[in-house]
Amino acid sequence: MLNNAMSVVILAAGKGTRMYSDLPKVLHTLAGKTMVQHVIDAANELGAAHVHLVYGHGGDLLKQALKNDNLNWVLQAEQLGTGHAMQQAAPFFADDEDILMLYGDVPLISVETLQRLRDAKPQGGIGLLTVKLDDPTGYGRITRENGKVTGIVEHKDATDEQRQIQEINTGILIANGADMKRWLAKLTNNNAQGEYYITDIIALAYQEGREIVAVHPQRLSEVEGVNNRLQLSRLERVYQSEQAEKLLLAGVMLRDPARFDLRGTLTHGRDVEIDTNVIIEGNVTLGHRVKIGAGCVIKNSVIGDDCEISPYTVVEDANLAAACTIGPFARLRPGAELLEGAHVGNFVEMKKARLGKGSKAGHLTYLGDAEIGDNVNIGAGTITCNYDGANKFKTIIGDDVFVGSDTQLVAPVTVGKGATIAAGTTVTRNIGENALAISRVPQAQKEGWRRPVKKK
């Protein structure tokens, strides 16, 4: 179906008192992303020409958090209802576009459901998203005559008979811009709350003989709003369960789907195995046959085929080629790069460092601002001293170098191909190819030496 141009209004002016937080409610996160960002992303994916964000409380915090989004900011200085919020945005509506109304605290609304709503909107009428609940207490009821939607009655204004209706309003609707502006201008606050209800436009449209078409979401969770942290935590689990199900059906082995969190996008190959309590953040790519141990955190990284990441390892903004082994308890910080077959063991930290093919840093090591060649062995306790308190410097280690335990490389320094560095050495000057570097103080031995005795 050919759709009209469309703009989206997102209502985000509420304070969120029941969150007991200094943050505006819509800035609380679900799956690592603010609730309102989920909604903005859905609007953009739908192809919205403009996204109007109606804000009130915490405007400065909202603008800072959403500074990279192309939004039209609309102030609602007083919170006088949903209709009043839409009235603030109405001057920005084009007559010939459709206006879709969304909510910043309803984060799981799907693009698929919104597209069905958009497709179902009749010419000159309203598309309305509704659901049926066993217990509709507190929600606006959908009234019908001969099956046709005639209006929405808020719970506080409903009669006993109307309160028996199970079909309720989700608040999400779409209508033509010119029609929306005309109906908004007719709203009154003659109700129990003394507010301007956007829902009253349904009755206004019906009185004009306009058609109102109701569409149901694929899942109830899509239209669940968040008013407190308990509701937010429940939606988090719903979201994570859905993501885990998709991954399992796509061939990823999650050892316990209930103990896996996806806070971004995961691209994966075949026969990937992920153990319990793993967190995936940002954009992560896992190659074929990758294994990730329990308790790992992987963020914005590319992991090549046949890599194995042992438990409790943190990988952030890193790139691993095929057949690398990491951990346990390793940390790869931004800029870490491992070439094919490289190994980083327990309690090894890398930042802005490249470890060559087949090279190994087995344990208790810091490699920062370093370029390490192929088939290099880094002994335990090795440190690249890259920072002088003001500036950072680079360490370059050639192929086939052996670095003994407890070595300090004071950058800037270059170690030539095939060199050997004896254990306990502090390297302050460049080392030539195939040379042995040693800087230990000669060992002294005192025969018959006795330890001091504590005084009683």
Curated annotation (Swiss-Prot):
Entry GO CC: cytoplasm; membrane
Protein location: Cytoplasm
SUPFAM superfamilies named in the record: Nucleotide-diphospho-sugar transferases, Trimeric LpxA-like enzymes
Any GO BP: UDP-N-acetylglucosamine biosynthetic process
Cofactor note: Binds 1 Mg(2+) ion per subunit.
Keyword hit for Cytoplasm: yes
Protein name per Swiss-Prot or TrEMBL: Bifunctional protein GlmU
Upper lineage: Bacteria, Pseudomonadati, Pseudomonadota, Gammaproteobacteria, Enterobacterales
Protein encoded by which gene: glmU
